Design a protein with these regions (language model features):
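Single-stranded nucleic acid-binding surfaces, predominantly the OB-fold ssDNA-binding core
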Residues: 1-89
Length: 89
């Protein structure tokens, strides 16, 4: 899948654990009803963001990932994340 828009926010790299890093950006989509979409780049894909800045018009190739989580009380919740794997002007 692909998202097109302007970079609204570019966050710093986060060290989530000793073996996992991620960097997030917020992309403002185009169209009649623009959306603010949070896209994660992880591990070796973080370097793809080097050279891009807030305000840049970009196309981002994404995967949508979902997961299930169960609380200690047995409640089940579902989470969705958007992972970027390619970015270009």
């Amino acid at each position: 899948m692909e998202l097109t828009g302007n970079i609204k926010v570019m966050m710093d790299t986060k060290e989530v654990s000793a073996s996992f890093r991620k960097r997030e950006l917020v992309l403002t989509t185009e169209g009649k009803y623009p959306q603010q979409i949070l896209v994660e780049f992880t591990q070796d894909k973080i370097g793809l963001l080097d050279g891009y800045r807030v305000g840049d018009q970009v196309r981002v190739q994404i995967d949508i990932r979902g997961r299930e989580w169960q609380s200690p009380r047995g409640e089940v919740k579902y989470f969705v994340s958007i992972h970027g794997w390619k970015i270009e002007n």
